[in-house]
Amino acid sequence: WYINQYDGKVPYEDMFFEELIPYMEKTYRIRSDKESRAIAGLSMGGYGSFLYSLHHPDMFCACAPLSAAVFDDTVMEARKARSHKDLFNRLFGPGDEHWKQNNVLKILSDWDQNNLPKIRYYIDCGDDDGLLDGNMQVHQIMRQKGIRHEFRVRDGGHSWTYWRTALPEVLKFVSQTFCRS
């Protein structure tokens, strides 16, 4: 899920920022400034891209989550008690603290109006995708907060057939964001 596991056993987010990005910058001829870096992902990776952009707003100029796995507290509680119980308890722990620190909706809702992230967002989710409600909640919070974003709901579900049609638009959006910087 691209987060640091609550018990510290799997520090995925730390690894991404402390090891992977420095390795990429050292190994390849890439620019290391925020204006030249975007993040995108689909499903669980969409959640990760949202989260990384919110935890590290100084690192990215654009974020493009597709069909992001964003859940509110009620969905999360239901999932902890059902089929995904082992997974979610392993990631977020038995309490709510780690969940709150990694809840995209809560982070956005709590964001200081005077210190909004200077990141352009492109959010895309299919109308038949079970994750649409969470993505719509993100859109509503962003509108209320005045966070710049594009929000697309198109015909389709949670599948590569859907995402393949979104990727050209995502690349265009990221390219335009780089050009503006």
Report each predicted region and the residues it spans.
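Non-catalytic cap/lid and distal C-terminal segments of serine-dependent acyl enzymes
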Residues: 1-181
